């Protein structure tokens, strides 16, 4: 039952993100996004900065990610980032080529389990090899 609620919440955020970013326009890089959208903010000129595992906000890429990555306890670029922050042992990268960072999980199997519930099977291969 919890997975049904989670799936419904993910669909709601993804739909909301698609409509908000379409109305905002590509040049402004504002609005709600999902790291699972391709490209995440409607254009590859903007970056989706997660505030949760499946929802974030669009920003210009000029140094925003570096500061946000250091401040956010679950954003990571490597397993070492997760261990340093105390947020887990595995950095599960989003199965999206436009997202250059990941989310900290306790283990690789936990990341695979989460991503398998919300992404198409062909995208899951990139999580397993990251």
From Swiss-Prot:
Changes after translation: The C-terminal glycine may be removed from PA1b.
Q: Which UniProt keywords apply?
A: Disulfide bond, Knottin, Seed storage protein, Signal, Storage protein, Toxin
- Annotated S-S bridges: 29-46, 33-48, 41-58
Tissue and organ expression note: Major component of both the cotyledons and embryonic axes of mature seeds.
| Entry keyword annotation includes Disulfide bond | yes
| InterPro entries for this protein | Albumin_I, Albumin_I_a
Propeptide stretches in the record: 64-69, 123-130
Signal peptide interval: 1-26
SUPFAM superfamilies linked to this entry: omega toxin-like (SSF57059)
Q: Which GO terms describe its molecular function?
A: nutrient reservoir activity; toxin activity
What function does the entry list?
A: PA1b binds to basic 7S globulin (BG) and stimulates its phosphorylation activity. Involved in the signal transduction system to regulate the growth and differentiation as a hormone peptide. Toxic to various insects through binding to a high affinity binding site in the insect gut.
The text the record gives for the protein's domains is: The presence of a 'disulfide through disulfide knot' structurally defines this protein as a knottin.
Report the protein name in the record. Answer: Albumin-1 A
In its UniProt entry, the species of origin is given as Pisum sativum
* Organism phylogeny: Eukaryota, Viridiplantae, Streptophyta, Embryophyta, Tracheophyta
């Amino acid at each position: 039952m919890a997975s049904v609620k989670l799936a419904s919440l993910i669909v709601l955020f993804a739909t909301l993100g698609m409509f908000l970013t379409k109305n905002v326009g590509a040049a402004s890089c504002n609005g709600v996004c999902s790291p699972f959208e391709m490209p995440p903010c409607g254009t590859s000129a903007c970056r989706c900065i997660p505030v949760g595992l499946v929802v974030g906000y669009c920003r210009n890429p000029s140094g925003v990610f570096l500061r946000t990555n250091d401040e956010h306890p679950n954003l990571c670029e490597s397993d070492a980032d997760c261990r340093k922050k105390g947020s887990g042992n595995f950095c599960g990268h989003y199965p999206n080529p436009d997202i250059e960072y990941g989310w900290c999980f306790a283990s690789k199997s936990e990341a695979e389990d989460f991503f398998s519930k919300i992404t198409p099977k062909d995208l899951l291969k990139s999580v397993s090899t990251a």
